[in-house]
Amino acid sequence: MTEAIGDEPLGDHVLELQIAEVVDETDEARSLVFAVPDGSDDPEIPPRRLRYAPGQFLTLRVPSERTGSVARCYSLCSSPYTDDALAVTVKRTADGYASNWLCDHAQVGMRIHVLAPSGNFVPTTLDADFLLLAAGSGITPIMSICKSALAEGGGQVTLLYANRDDRSVIFGDALRELAAKYPDRLTVLHWLESLQGLPSASALAKLVAPYTDRPVFICGPGPFMQAARDALAALKVPAQQVHIEVFKSLESDPFAAVKVDDSGDEAPATAVVELDGQTHTVSWPRTAKLLDVLLAAGLDAPFSCREGHCGACACTLRAGKVNMGVNDVLEQQDLDEGLILACQSRPESDSVEVTYDE
């Protein structure tokens, strides 16, 4: 366990990566390419702990003089199918302490604590046609999905990408290279506010109308995502076809060592957990949350916020009953399908079975 200056001790689930490359994408955005400090044979970070899917994110621990550190989630722009290393892209924001710190101070050789890749903004298959809608730095997870779909799938990919002006376009050269490599499969539609004004729902609807039979992935600032959702609703695109990525600032410290609440007098429940193809049985104190129990047992259960906001810890309840304290992300359809948030679930039955592998 590593001690963190000004913070609680770090948990065993925390990983330390090294910045191998810093790429200036625009005047306001930089990509950070990561490497394992001691190489791929580092026993502290086996390759399975860095496995990820297109559309997922890393949670970074950024130093802070005021609080010791802050935790922020940044989408992976790299693709597990085309890139050797994990990479995230960070864009400056007016009030964004962490993003500004990374843009000002991140340099090659710097080590930074991260959590394992996580997130549910992931296509169920890459062999499909896609409609990808991005604005500003929202291109980051969209780029990962785009590269992966083109490399591994055989379908058509249409990307609508909105920016303030031409100088604000992140990955401009990379998108041109992809369009040249896949001229019959990739269509890129740029929207520049300097020329076209803010993208409205009606304008977006006209542009995306030919592509409404596809899975849709949306990421960008709130007003853009709302306009995109309104456009798709006007076109009667089914809600289950639309996937949206939203990040919230984390209030708790997901890097802190896990403390299992076992203060209750009632006998613990039993949790049977299927994770990465293996089945584990753990004792589950009635007052403890499932995620804390799994992490304390040394299992690499996925998570990010621990606050019920992001959905990264979602798993499927196969048997038994649980009580969720906070749920800001799962919709009724998800609940009907048995999804629960491990970071918010406490047992209500003596035995509970869940799986992360569905």
Swiss-Prot record:
Induction of expression: Induced by KstR.
Residues at which [2Fe-2S] cluster binds: C305, C310, C313, C343
Task of the protein: Involved in the degradation of cholesterol. Catalyzes the introduction of a 9a-hydroxyl moiety into 1,4-androstadiene-3,17-dione (ADD) to yield the 9alpha-hydroxy-1,4-androstadiene-3,17-dione (9OHADD) intermediate which spontaneously form 3-hydroxy-9,10-seconandrost-1,3,5(10)-triene-9,17-dione (HSA) via the meta-cleavage of ring B with concomitant aromatization of ring A.
Keyword annotations of the record: 2Fe-2S, Cholesterol metabolism, FAD, Flavoprotein, Iron, Iron-sulfur, Lipid degradation, Lipid metabolism, Metal-binding, Oxidoreductase, Steroid metabolism, Sterol metabolism, Virulence
Disulfide-bond pairs as recorded: none
Molecular function GO terms recorded: 2 iron, 2 sulfur cluster binding; 3-ketosteroid 9-alpha-monooxygenase activity; FAD binding; flavin adenine dinucleotide binding; ketosteroid monooxygenase activity; metal ion binding; oxidoreductase activity
Organism per entry: Mycobacterium tuberculosis (strain ATCC 25618 / H37Rv)
GO BP terms, alphabetized: cholesterol catabolic process; cholesterol metabolic process; response to hypoxia; response to nitrosative stress; steroid biosynthetic process
EC number: 1.14.15.30
Top-rank lineage group of the source organism: Bacteria
Protein name: 3-ketosteroid-9-alpha-monooxygenase, ferredoxin reductase component
Biological or metabolic pathway of the protein: Lipid metabolism; steroid biosynthesis
Keyword match Flavoprotein: yes
Cofactor note: Binds 1 FAD per subunit.
Oxidoreductase listed as a keyword: yes
Cofactor: FAD; [2Fe-2S] cluster
Catalyses which reaction(s): androsta-1,4-diene-3,17-dione + 2 reduced [2Fe-2S]-[ferredoxin] + O2 + 2 H(+) = 9alpha-hydroxyandrosta-1,4-diene-3,17-dione + 2 oxidized [2Fe-2S]-[ferredoxin] + H2O
